[in-house]
Amino acid sequence: MRAAIFLNGSPDSEPLIQAVAGRADLVVAADGGARYALAAGIVPDLVVGDMDSLGEDLALEVERRGASLERHPARKDMMDGHLAVLAAGERGVTAADFLCAAGGKPGAVFAVPHILLAAERIGLRSTVVTDWGRMFVIEGRSRLVEGSARDSVSIFPLSTQATGVTLEGMGYPLENADLYPGDTLGFHNELIGTEARVSVERGALLVVQETSAP
């Protein structure tokens, strides 16, 4: 089961939003992310959060139009985006595409990789989809990177140590390497064909792909 999860970052293009949300079985919005969904003509199935960014009037309006609201207190230990991930997992979602996740408040920008890691840890295969490319996190496993030759691919460790890092199908391959925070070895690699594979035996990696393809 696949979900499209709207965050409250910067808006993506309407064609991208409609294409990604159109292939989802469930559309979830984290609080103010519902605004971006509505602006693209999409009513979320579920809105999660404290509704401070969305506002009470619009929250009631989106509920009137068929969305379910999962309300949380303003004082909480998780971001609305993290709560949206958990809500999706509870509903049987196994894959999620995040929209409107890049940009926005600086603190929220740096939180996105950690939301992806939270999704990874509950078994959600997740990808941030943007007009400039994609971003995902893997922990202790491998994943294909699909795109076009010469797409830029950068990898960054999200844990104190990422061990057994292997890159196949890229211009600068790695085999069983170890990466540490503060290490820029993984910056700006590139695909040599239409797909490559990133693997890590232990630890977590953030993978950022820059491509012109949606």
Where are each of the predicted segments found?
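N-terminal beta-strand-loop-alpha-helix module at the start
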Residues: 1-62
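General beta-strand structural signal in soluble alpha/beta enzymes
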Residues: 6, 28-31, 49, 70-71, ...
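Short glycine/serine/threonine-rich phosphate/pyrophosphate-binding segments
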Residues: 13-16, 78-82, 105-110
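Short phosphate-binding loop-to-helix
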Residues: 69-90
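Active-site/ligand-binding-proximal alpha/beta "capping" segment
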Residues: 83-100, 175
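Anionic-ligand-binding alpha/beta catalytic cores of soluble enzymes and soluble regulatory domains
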Residues: 95-144
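Long, charged alpha-helical interface segments
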Residues: 138-214
